[in-house]
C-alpha cells in the first residue's frame, strides 16, 4: 500500500498518491491517532470508489481536492476508463454532506479532450 502523506508548512497533512480512498480505514485510524496535533487533513481523490469508502472518513477530512478529467460523461469515460455515474454520484454526495467551500475540483487542460463548456457545471465549487 502506498499513501503519500505531505506535511504542509507544519499545519496539516494531505493524503494522496494513487487513490487514497481505497485505504479509508487506514486513513481514519491515522487521523484518530493524530487529531490532537491540530493539523488539518486534506484528501486528494478521483472519487472513483464505492460510496462507503467516502462515508467512512468524510467527517475526518477538513478539505477535499477532487481530480477529474472532464464533466462530459463520454469524454470522462473515454479518458479514465471509469464510471462517470459513480464519480458524479460521489461528487454530489460530497457536496451535499460537506459543502462546496470544503471542496476544490481540479481539471487539467487536456488538448483535444476538455473545454470550458464541458467543465462549467463545476462553477458552484472551486475549480482549479
Feature locations, PLM:
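Conserved AdoMet/S-adenosylmethionine-binding subsite of the radical SAM
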Residues: 2-128
Amino acid at each position: 500500500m502506498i499513501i503519500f502523506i505531505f506535511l504542509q508548512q507544519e499545519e496539516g497533512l494531505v493524503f494522496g498518491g494513487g487513490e487514497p480512498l481505497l485505504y479509508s480505514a487506514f486513513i481514519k485510524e491515522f487521523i484518530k491517532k493524530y487529531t490532537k496535533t491540530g493539523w488539518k487533513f486534506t484528501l486528494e481523490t478521483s472519487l472513483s470508489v464505492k460510496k462507503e469508502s467516502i462515508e467512512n472518513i468524510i467527517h475526518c477530512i477538513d478539505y477535499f481536492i477532487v481530480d477529474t478529467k472532464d464533466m462530459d460523461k463520454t469524454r470522462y469515460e473515454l479518458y479514465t476508463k471509469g464510471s462517470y455515474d459513480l464519480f458524479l454520484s460521489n461528487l454530489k454526495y460530497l457536496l451535499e454532506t460537506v459543502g462546496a467551500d470544503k471542496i476544490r475540483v481540479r481539471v487539467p487542460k487536456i488538448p483535444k479532450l476538455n473545454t470550458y463548456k464541458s467543465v462549467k457545471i463545476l462553477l458552484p465549487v472551486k475549480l482549479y
